[in-house]
Amino acid sequence: MSFNLKKYGIDVVELYRNASVPALYELALTKEKGTTISDAGALCVYSGEKTGRSPKDKRIVRNPASEYNIDWGDINIALDEHVFHINRERAIDYLNTRSRIYVVDAFAGWDENYRLKVRIICTRAYHALFMQNMLIMPSAEELENFGEPDYVIYNGGGFPANRHTSHMTSKTSIDLHLESKEIVILGTEYAGEMKKGVFSVMNYLM
């Protein structure tokens, strides 16, 4: 059976899972406006309005299972379950409007006994390329036996959050749910939010 994302409610025509670097370069150059290659061979892209992280727009779902392990305040800002699901559905709806989706299945951490299996679902080739550099890519055999991921990132960053929804301060929202093991990104195409999301999980577990 071919790989698909239907279990997440995502069904698109083109799906690229752990695409090669040359393939991602080609897709970025041919499908993403303004993308070019520098004289050093680096892929140059536009990340949109956001050119850096948005720490004030990061939220963590407040849940009885983990709330006493988190120092809530100006850095760790709480989000309720209902709003998380609104944002998750918004991201999935956006992903379903795209003609192509990129998936990166990779590991966070070197030690096989402790590493996390992470699945990134995104709409831009440069996002996939970035996360292939940030995480540890599986061998062909490891990918074949990857199974279910420990965490899933839904990167719907090309679509804004509804700033009138409770707990939202702007059209950008990066939401972490430690219990459902999901991260939702809206309103920013800055790739560093995916990396920081994974690092936040790793720091919490350590």
Descriptions of predicted regions:
Residues M1-L205:
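A noncatalytic interaction/capping subdomain that flanks phosphate/NTP-handling catalytic cores
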